[in-house]
Amino acid sequence: MKKIPLTSVTSGLGIEILPDLYCLSVQIANVCFIGDPRQTNEFILIDAGMPDSAGLIIEEAKNRFGEDCKLISIILTHGHFDHIGALQELLEKWNVPVYAHSLEEPYLTGKENYPPPNKDIPGLVAKMSPLFPRHSIDVSSNLHILPPSGKLPSLPGWEYIHTPGHTPGHISLFRENDRVLIAGDAFTNVEQESLY
């Protein structure tokens, strides 16, 4: 069984999980490309990586789907800096819809910053989190709120599961027919102290 690395050992390392699911490590985060390059040049991007990673993501898309690759939409698991870092640059190249849970809307429209982290949570990642950027961005002109049904626009066969805790509107993506789960950062919701 192929697994996406918990943290990126080598930034820029791509792993084909399935013919239509490819994950790319971008420093401490992962982005996923959904689409089978043997059948189409179109793809959906899950998350938008770290700041200054747009070039890497665009280059990987071209390598996988061809120079004329076409991004259909971006689905965000949540709006933390390591999942939206290249979002605005990607939208300059591809003016596409961005889908997120309604509870992430304030952080993606510039209305609110994420609250400060809880200092009482143990673990190295939790202790480092006050150093992470918490500021919001404004992509309101591209932002679309996911429907409450759990269905994912432009991704037939996939659904989203609201997995709050890491952020209020955190989602994970699931495809029933092959039991694929893209967890986002949901793994940090339980026993975070065991993470480092």
Regions found by a protein language model. Give the residues of each.
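Active-site metal-binding motif and surrounding structural segment of the metallo-beta-lactamase
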Residues: A54-A100, E104
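Metallo-beta-lactamase
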Residues: K2-P5, T10-S11, E104-I161
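Conserved beta-strand hairpin/beta-sheet module of binuclear metal-dependent hydrolase folds
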Residues: T10-F65, S172-G184, N189
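Core dinuclear metal-dependent hydrolase active-site scaffold
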Residues: F33, S149-R175
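Short, intrinsically disordered, charge-balanced linker/junction segments flanking boundaries
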Residues: L146, Q192-Y196
